Every structure is written in C-alpha cells, then in structure tokens.
Amino acid sequence: MYAERLTDRYEVHVLTSRAIDYITWKDEYAAGEEMLNGVHVHRFSVAHPRVPADFDAINGRFLQGFLEPDEEEQWVEEQGPYLPELIDYLKAHEAEYEAFLFCTYLYYPTCMGVKAVAKKAITIPTAHDEPFLRMRIFDDVFQKPKAIFYNTAEEEKFVESKYHNAAIRSEIGGAGVVLPENVSPDAFREKYGFTNYLLYVGRIDEGK
C-alpha cells in the first residue's frame, strides 16, 4: 500500500523476503528483482527458515524472564525473517536512496536495517504495549531513525513515554485502505443472509 501510493512522486524499491508463510519464512517466491504495479521488488533468500520449536523455546525463555541481554540478537534472528543479504544490500547501496522506510518494529529486517542506515531511516513501528518492547535490542528502532511515522496518536504517546524520543521528527497518518466504489450494508445482509452480525477488521490469523 505505502509503496504503490508513493510511485506518483518517487521511484520506489521494496526489499523483502521470498517467503509467504510468516511461521517458517520458507523461500517460495523466485529470488531476484521484478516490477510489480510500478514498484521495483527485490526478493532476498532467508538464510535459515524459522524452526517453530526453536523459536518457541527461546521466546518462552524470554517471556519467563530468563533471556540474557546478549541473547536478544539470537531471538531476533529466530523471529526472522533472517535476511543478512538484505542488510548487506542496505549498507552497499545506501547512497543510492533518499530514504528507507521500515515497517513494523518486531522483525529482523527493521531491527537490523534501522541500525544499518539510521541517518536515512523512517520507522513505521506499529507498536503497542507488549512484552517484546522490554528488549534493549529494539531501542535503536525508536531512538536512532531520522523520522517516525505513527498509525495513531495513542501509539505516538506510548512510544514517546517509553523511549523519550519526542525530539525525533514524527507524523501520524495510518496505513490507508482502498474502499470499494459501492458499499451497502443492505446488500451485504442480502448476499449473506445475515440480520445481525459482528464485523472483524484485520488479517485472518489464529493469534488474532
């Protein structure tokens, strides 16, 4: 969504994995580059897929308070997607780009990518109050970027109270959605045969 909307003003490149499944991060798409809806997409191979049992073990130790600070990098690598070649690309090509947008603080590409190109980094953290923010390894994601783009005022207030980073330039904007041309609650009820219903907005995921 961000990438396609920016193509009106910029040449946009997306650096991403070859994965579809975020549980294992297994390579599925072809490696290399392609043009997709006006966006240059660069796909990098996952150096090692996530083994759910291994991640559950180290994550369980963290949640129980037994993870040492020097083990946090291992946690981030197990969290994935583990893409050291993507980080190498950032370092090698930093001068070719005006800015780097990193979306969602919790994953390896953002955690390590912001450190690699902090002077040009714009973080879109999508942060909320959860245990993983106790990890010191994420501090740079919130304290080192050139700018931060928050989804809500509540997120901004929460992050600034935790990381004392109000001096970093920030804006609030959300992610945006593409609305259908014709939206009719009556047509929805007729199509599905519902009278009363609960509308869920979000991805279909067991954890949600």
Question: Predicted regions: what is each one?
Answer:
Residues 12-14, 122, 128, 144-153, ...:
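A short beta-strand/loop micro-motif in the catalytic core of glycosyltransferases
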Residues 2, 91, 109, 115-116, ...:
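Membrane-proximal helix-turn-helix segments that form the acceptor-binding/catalytic region
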Residues 1-45, 95:
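N-terminal subdomain of nucleotide-sugar transferases
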Residues 128-129, 154-155, 172-183, 205:
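Short beta-strand->alpha-helix junction loop in the catalytic core
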Residues 191-208:
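Conserved donor-binding/catalytic core segment of Leloir-type glycosyltransferases
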